[in-house]
Regions:
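P/S/T/G-enriched low-complexity
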Residues: 3-7, 36-475
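Short glycine- and Lys/Arg-enriched binding-loop motifs that mark or flank ligand-binding interfaces
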Residues: 11, 29, 348
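Alpha-helical hydrophobic helix detector
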Residues: 22-36, 50
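Glycine-centered recognition micro-motifs in short, flexible terminal segments and loops
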Residues: 2-26
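Short glycine-rich loop/turn motifs that provide flexible caps or phosphate-binding loops at active sites
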Residues: 14, 32, 351
Length: 475
């Protein structure tokens, strides 16, 4: 009889859907519960990963990179993580594991965590929580403490007009109508001669330029250095006074010092290594090198003298670099670690042509009285860089002194054509002069600006490039 009842039940199709649903209900509830709890756990993991990212980045911000105590760095990262990781649906706020690795100026932070997401269906899954974990790594190099040695060319060639209009006006107002010294007439350079009367003049070309409000290249260099040390209106951080250097020091939370020099036949000290603000006081003292008169640099010149002959000269770039090299100490990493010292950086601003009395002239042939006019001999640059010192070069391009309506030069300069033009071809941007200066600079730290260009902007951009550092999230 039981057997018959079972057979009737098997053949009966009434209520089959309800029975099948009842049989499937248990696994469906299990799957729905597991899916809901798993989805909530993944959401918690994403939020905790974001907290770990924020904590890792916070620990490599510029302000933290100056902190040498790992416990302070870890506490900062932990506080940021805790503020963002206090989420509902966790059994407790997780305590992160924070690993700090410093290598020189580089710091790597790893923030990892393990948390328990509370399950809504603990009986279905057979456990109260679902474990989630994750980590974030951030790496940054702190902006190093740096000493900057600003080396500005003040030789007579830096007295050229700043723009083509200035050059044209200089040539115009040094004509015989305005300049009685024949050797200084029709000249695009505002040479500063202390004994212009020797040549029959009453005022030198520099005095004429000042009287006519003609801007010179050295004026633009002075303005650029002033922006670097004294006044910059574009600092993105409020409350910072001073120039670009002070602004970048504040942004990078680091220390910069500056020394200010000019050079011609030798090195001229305007400010030894000090704060940028103190060095900035001396910017107004940047001025053109004076000469006694044409073809006589110093009083007492003589054709028989080996050091003060009767010829024009006045630019010893390699000599200035050698003198700076003797002043600069061995560079450090620039960290705040005990015993470490700042990095050392030379900023060279020049038109790139040496004009000096020398026993050797490796890049050119001698003119009269052992006068060597040549592109920079980079031997000293190599010596400095081999010490681990960086060199940044701003090339104020040597204008091609060839008659041209474009440049405003009315007459081709025969001296230029004889001694300089071959190094200034095919253009001032690509000739041997430019190539030598680029070879002198450390990789990536070279810039050039043509006559009439923005020297202030070029020097500012070059400095920011040297001083910049970044932090990045690795994973």
């Amino acid at each position: 009889m039981l057997r018959r009842a079972m057979l009737r039940f098997a053949r009966d199709r009434k209520a089959n859907v309800a029975i099948i649903f009842a049989l499937m209900l248990v696994p469906i509830v299990f799957l729905l519960g597991m899916t809901l709890d798993y989805t909530l756990a993944l959401r918690k993991q994403e939020q905790l990963n974001a907290a770990a990212d924020a904590a890792a980045i916070a620990a490599v911000r510029p302000a933290m990179l100056t902190q040498s105590d790992d416990s302070v760095v870890q506490a900062t990262a932990a506080a940021v993580f805790a503020a963002k990781a206090n989420l509902p649906g966790l059994s407790s706020t997780p305590t992160p594991t924070i690993n700090v690795v410093d290598s020189g100026l580089a710091r790597t932070i790893t923030v990892s965590y393990v948390a328990q997401s509370v399950n809504n269906f603990p009986s279905v899954l057979g456990r109260q929580t679902w474990q989630v974990s994750g980590s974030a790594t951030a790496r940054a190099s702190s902006a190093p403490n740096m000493n900057f040695y600003l080396l500005m060319d003040d030789s007579p060639s830096m007295g050229i007009g700043a723009t083509t209009t200035d050059i044209s006006n200089l040539i115009k107002y040094t004509a015989s109508k305005y300049q009685s010294a024949a050797s200084s007439q029709n000249c695009g350079f505002a040479c500063h001669e202390t004994n212009i009367a020797h040549d029959g003049g009453t005022q030198d070309n520099l005095a004429i330029a000042r009287a006519r409000n003609i801007t010179l290249r050295i004026d633009l260099v002075t303005s650029a250095v002033n922006q670097l040390l004294n006044s910059w209106s574009n600092c993105p951080q409020s409350g910072v006074s001073g120039g670009v250097m002070q602004c970048m020091a504040a942004l990078n939370n680091t220390t910069y010092r500056a020394a200010l020099y000019t050079f011609d036949v030798g090195l001229n000290t305007l400010a030894t290594l000090t704060t940028p603000t103190t060095a900035g006081i001396q910017v107004s003292n940047i001025s053109l090198m004076p000469v006694y008169y044409q073809n006589c640099v110093f009083s007492g010149c003589s054709s028989s003298s080996t050091t003060n002959p009767t010829t024009d000269f006045g630019t010893d770039i390699a000599g200035a670099l050698s003198s700076i090299n003797n002043i600069m100490p061995a560079p450090g990493l620039g960290s705040n670690a005990s015993g470490d010292t700042p990095q050392e950086v030379v900023f060279l601003v020049t038109d790139g042509v040496e004009d000096k009395i020398s026993a050797t002239c490796p890049n050119a042939s001698f003119a009269s009285h052992s006068r060597c006019q040549q592109p920079l001999d980079t031997t000293m640059c190599t010596t400095i860089k081999n010490r681990g010192i960086k060199i940044a070069v701003l090339y104020t391009e040597y204008l091609q002194l060839i008659a041209s309506a474009t440049t405003g030069i009315q007459t081709t300069d025969s001296w230029y054509m004889s001694w300089i033009d071959t190094y200034d071809e095919p253009t001032s941007s690509t000739g041997t002069i430019a190539q030598k200066l680029q070879a002198c600079a450390s990789p990536g730290f070279y810039a050039s600006v043509q006559t009439g260009g923005d020297i202030s902007g070029a020097l500012t951009n070059l400095f920011i490039k040297v001083a910049s550092s970044t932090a990045s999230l690795v994973q």
